[in-house]
From Swiss-Prot:
Family the UniProt entry places it in: Belongs to the transglycosylase family. IsaA subfamily.
UniProt signal peptide: 1-28
Cell compartment(s), UniProt: Secreted
Origin species: Staphylococcus epidermidis (strain ATCC 35984 / DSM 28319 / BCRC 17069 / CCUG 31568 / BM 3577 / RP62A)
Alphabetic keyword roster: Glycosidase, Hydrolase, Secreted, Signal
Compositional bias of kind Polar residues: 95-115
Protein name, entry field: Probable transglycosylase IsaA
UniProt xrefs under InterPro entries: Lysozyme-like_dom_sf
Gene name in the database record: isaA
Purpose of the protein: Is able to cleave peptidoglycan.
SUPFAM superfamilies assigned: Lysozyme-like
Annotated Low complexity bias: 117-147
Length: 235
């Protein structure tokens, strides 16, 4: 598997009058005593520092292999470069970068910023979307019981008893009155419907609103009550 790595070259020229950099050849002791682990860490994780300054003063020519990679650090005393590649590969994995030149004098300085390409890699990412399901709050109607039973046996039932209690809270009319209306109109059947179009516990007409749920039916009955009072149910 091929791997692309960064190699950077930085050239520095000083324009201060009377100042020059003298060449220096590295001795064996200068290259063998270098901290190779530190150089590996810089090349792999901190290339900016290698671009900013040479690894040591003077000229040097450092080459070594570590953990399957060939590392190269060279300088002629005024220019330096570094690179690393897979050791023993028949392909060159060193990518040259733009040179940075810094000119300095006693009055002004001009800097051309170096553009360094980041390593490229093929990366696969998988994304999962979370799904949240929502359910309408449910009510336990079994806790409500009707206290009204008509002579024909009709009652408001547990759902009707709940609806009657809600209407009593909204209108101030007793819950037993609303249970009586529900027992007479629908026998406590939530989905009761007749040919006139009236539907639900309170047998309200479509103009008063939806009767799809218990709360819808309570809202529709309340609208009818606000408009006509109990006369909406012939009382």
């Amino acid at each position: 598997m091929k791997k692309t790595v960064i190699a950077s070259t930085l050239a520095v020229s000083l324009g201060i009058a009377g100042y020059g950099l003298s060449g220096h050849e590295a001795h064996a002791s200068e290259t063998t005593n270098v901290d190779k682990a530190h150089l590996v860490d810089l090349a792999q994780h901190n290339p900016e520092e290698l671009n900013a300054k040479p690894v040591q003063a003077g000229a040097y020519d450092i080459h070594f292999v570590d953990n399957g990679y060939q590392y190269n650090f060279t300088s002629n005393g005024s220019e330096w470069s570094w690179s690393y590649a897979v050791a023993g590969s028949d392909a060159d994995y060193t990518e040259s970068s733009s040179n940075q030149e810094v000119s300095a004098n006693t009055q002004s300085s001009n800097t051309n910023v170096q553009a360094v390409s980041a390593p490229t890699s093929s990366e696969s990412r998988s994304y999962s979307t979370s799904t949240t399901s929502y359910s309408a709050p449910s009510h336990n109607y079994s806790s409500h019981s009707s206290s009204v039973r008509l002579s024909n046996g009709n009652t408001a039932g547990s759902v009707g008893s709940y609806a009657a209690a809600q209407m009593a809270a909204r209108t101030g009319v007793s819950a037993s009155t609303w249970e009586h209306i529900i027992a007479r109109e629908s026998n406590g059947q939530l989905h009761a419907r007749n040919a006139s179009g009236a539907a639900g516990l309170f047998q309200t007409m479509p103009g008063w609103g939806s009767t799809g749920s218990v709360n819808d039916q309570i809202n529709a009955a309340y609208k009818a009550y606000k408009a006509q009072g109990l006369s909406a149910w012939g009382m």
